[in-house]
Amino acid sequence: MAAAAAGAGSGPWAAQEKQFPPALLSFFIYNPRFGPREGQEENKILFYHPNEVEKNEKIRNVGLCEAIVQFTRTFSPSKPAKSLHTQKNRQFFNEPEENFWMVMVVRNPIIEKQSKDGKPVIEYQEEELLDKVYSSVLRQCYSMYKLFNGTFLKAMEDGGVKLLKERLEKFFHRYLQTLHLQSCDLLDIFGGISFFPLDKMTYLKIQSFINRMEESLNIVKYTAFLYNDQLIWSGLEQDDMRILYKYLTTSLFPRHIEPELAGRDSPIRAEMPGNLQHYGRFLTGPLNLNDPDAKCRFPKIFVNTDDTYEELHLIVYKAMSAAVCFMIDASVHPTLDFCRRLDSIVGPQLTVLASDICEQFNINKRMSGSEKEPQFKFIYFNHMNLAEKSTVHMRKTPSVSLTSVHPDLMKILGDINSDFTRVDEDEEIIVKAMSDYWVVGKKSDRRELYVILNQKNANLIEVNEEVKKLCATQFNNIFFLD
């Protein structure tokens, strides 16, 4: 067990300070093999943001990154450069496929103070950015690109460098606008999945529903079922599901919240055969099934890219708080008739199922009792099944990460996680922050638990007891080493 003091208060100068969060300065992708000779350097650059940057500066920046990678390769041939720290910014490197390099340059947070003569003084917060967080964000950029476009190599095989450049431009031009670097934290490192807690009977109902749907709609290859933005069941491989889950919960679902709230009180189609009301609708695909000219276009996704390399249509269908993803082979083109059939089969059953889940969830909530606000917040992650649970985050979307704790405490959580990465053994770290909060990190059997306690008069022994109590109540079926 290790104990330490960390964190800083806001200080007397806070009122005169202006704070600027980290910001994306540039993002580029290059392949050194594409322009090996002098005068061909521009050919190496496959994508560069911002595009307005002058050509020679782009070539210079890419050349510098190449030199850094080559230099660090002499010390670590298999794992060259990961990040480069400077006073004003930090550069992150990732080689997702052989010779394809992605680089993200992030400006360090800035504090602007007034000097005695009234002139602004800029201070760069060099130690505020956590390498692990932003390296994870860069890896996510590739994973999200790969989900919708396949690998870089696939684009090269399909249409050479020209097609790859087009795909990179089309995807990253939009995707980089959704990167809100000030909201990135420990959850980005984990890239986990929040699972919805269910009793056995309701879980069996969902399993039965999925089996019936896959049988009725026999072209469905994989299915995933979510409720309240939390996963209940998935037929995909873990790594494919984690990135699809991120897309659904931070991009697709938030875009459809407004229309859902507006139409919540009345079924979308009240007149159904057999008088079954249903609230089902497509989140991808046709907007209006009654329009004979409605387009049945669904986004394509690529899964199992290391193995069988499958290209699929992604059909996302939602009723109330329940969403089901049907994935069908891309060689099959869904017609309007198929969409109407899916709507008539899935809609009523999913509506009933969503009501059942909601009812069961409320019963379980009442049985557990409405306790007063606990004196602790926690983040839990299981590396084996990617399960993630956080009471620190009230809401996590790309544009905002509403955390109920101070950023200083989030930074300590990240520092503890970095310490955990350096050792393979199970361990526990306890930190007393300057703000009098206690922060505890436990790593045991490929699981990690981070607890923030608001008990300033507690000592180490009492803090340890509180964490044991938390483990007993919140994680009673999970074994944490003492």
From Swiss-Prot:
Q: Identify residues that carry N-acetylalanine.
A: 2
A single GO cellular-component term from the record reads: intracellular membrane-bounded organelle
GO BP annotations of the record are:
vesicle-mediated transport
Location comes to: Lysosome membrane
Its keywords, alphabetically, are: Acetylation, Guanine-nucleotide releasing factor, Lysosome, Membrane, Phosphoprotein
GO MF annotation terms = guanyl-nucleotide exchange factor activity
Residues annotated as carrying Phosphoserine in the record are 76, 266
A matching Pfam family: Intu_longin_1
State the InterPro entries in the record: Ccz1, CCZ1/INTU/HSP4_longin_1, CCZ1/INTU/HSP4_longin_3, CCZ1/INTU_longin_2
Keyword Membrane included in the entry's annotation: yes
- For the keyword Kinase, the answer is no
What is its biological role?
A: Acts in concert with MON1A, as a guanine exchange factor (GEF) for RAB7, promotes the exchange of GDP to GTP, converting it from an inactive GDP-bound form into an active GTP-bound form.
* Quaternary context: Interacts with MON1A. Found in a complex with RMC1, CCZ1, MON1A and MON1B.
User: So what family is this one in?
Assistant: Belongs to the CCZ1 family.
Entry-linked PANTHER family: VACUOLAR FUSION PROTEIN CCZ1 HOMOLOG-RELATED
The protein's name is Vacuolar fusion protein CCZ1 homolog
Q: Which gene encodes it?
A: CCZ1
